Amino acid sequence: MSKFAERLQTVANKPEVFQKFSRGLERESLRYTPEGALTQTPHPKALGAALTHRWITTDFAESLLEFITPVSHEVDTLLAQMSDIHHFAQTKLGDEKLWPLSMPCYVGSEEGIVLAQYGSSNTGKMKTLYREGLKRRYGSLMQIISGVHFNFSFPESFWDALFGEQEESARQASKSAAYFGVIRNYYRFGWLIPYLFGASPALCSSFLQGRKTDLPFESIGKTLYLPYATSLRLSDLGYTNSAQSVLQIGFNSIEQYLQGLNEAIRTPSAEFAKLGVKVEGEYRQLNSNVLQIENELYAPIRPKRVTQSGERPSQALARAGVEYIEVRSLDVNPFSPIGINEDQVRFLDLFLAWTALSDSDPMDGCELACWRDNWRKVVLEGRKPGLELQIGCHGEVLTLQAWAKRVFADLRVIAETMDAALGGDAYQAVCAKLETWIENPELTLSAQILAEIKQHGGLGKTGCALGNEYRAVNLQHQYQFYSQDEMEQEVRRSTQAQADIEAKETLNFDAYLTQYFAYLQAVS
């Protein structure tokens, strides 16, 4: 019996393990006008304060909404919460709609993208200044690409089964080590996610704004596409940071990761220094380091812990270890009114359980570079017949199909185990359905949306058609988890909470930033 099979059997003896997976969702979506253009209006007051609202905030731009669910154990509850949030938001948007694709709608110029505003508090001003820095460093267009983030953790019973009884400090160390094992395996095999669920094979030519690219795009009107691409969002055209390529951040342990991250936020950038930090009394960025703050680090998956007041993400991890992981490589699903569906959530359950139960050897920089090259191939040409991927750094290759089948052989066993514990056949059904997509790439989301784009005559028309449909769906939706009263109450609470923060402000902004970044002066 393999170690994977042994570990699965150990966990299977505690069926309650599978009932207590913790999941949360974050979905980004641009507000757009009936004409199909990015909206210029401020974040609607009827949605509450973006700074303090628990479920509805903004990401980079005023027009880029972000919907956040709390943590739940039931898949149905998770999706009901997200549907309710979409319903409430759409009722407050007038004739504006939510863009249903990851790649943005028509953008006349970068200057038309208004940075997200969070009020007059130092916290709020710092959030906007961070975005000003991103704009000056990378341009605004890259920042308004939308995605879905999936937050996930295993219950204590899962770790009990794997590790037995442990003291608290030993348990936390074991959990952190295991989550970093998940992260390494995600880099190794996570290309399956853009293969199956990537949904950005095309973009509007306005997105390039004259930038040169060597990619062999084909065109439909003003839409550019790659025939076998799965996720241009995850390509070099999407959210990546070439300046970060110099960083040496490893994933072999929490200590190695934190050391790399702490070095990164202290690494000066000659390129970003040329932009200036404060010029003629006006701030242009938080600082001129490679990363202004830790959140700027690009990653398809992140180790996370809920932060305490005033705590940076790395401080939270150093204090108490990894609490959950954040999967960040999901495109918005254009065939769902809420950007993700039940099949995807259940597949992620299976896949993340598999990455935790499988062996996960340490990974050096060379190996990580090889895995990243596999990701690059899959996002640009994942549906290409006979596409070969590297197995490590030793010249061995395997077709995507052959490798995916090996993974699904294990996923089927996990699906059987989970269904036996939970009752029904939901996981086996999802596994069987998605396995057919391996030999039939035309069934993948990227192939389906590309077919729609060709049928409609472009990305803009496709997005508008789907956006119209989902506006109606979201408006007609009946609350399943929340209520109108709860939603209105959160609007009032968040608005008051922002006012309270602003009223208590005592430091001027310069002093606040000096205090916040005091850690950069400290010895790491």
From Swiss-Prot:
Keyword ATP-binding found: yes
UniProt KW keywords: ATP-binding, Glutathione biosynthesis, Ligase, Nucleotide-binding
Pathway participation: Sulfur metabolism; glutathione biosynthesis; glutathione from L-cysteine and L-glutamate: step 1/2
HAMAP family registered for this protein in UniProt: Glu_cys_ligase (MF_00578)
GO-annotated molecular function: ATP binding; glutamate-cysteine ligase activity; metal ion binding
Top-level taxonomic group: Bacteria
Enzyme class: ligase
Name the record gives this protein: Glutamate--cysteine ligase
Any single GO CC term annotated in Swiss-Prot or TrEMBL for this entry: cytosol
UniProt similarity note: Belongs to the glutamate--cysteine ligase type 1 family. Type 1 subfamily.
EC number(s) on file: 6.3.2.2
Gene Ontology biological-process annotations: glutathione biosynthetic process
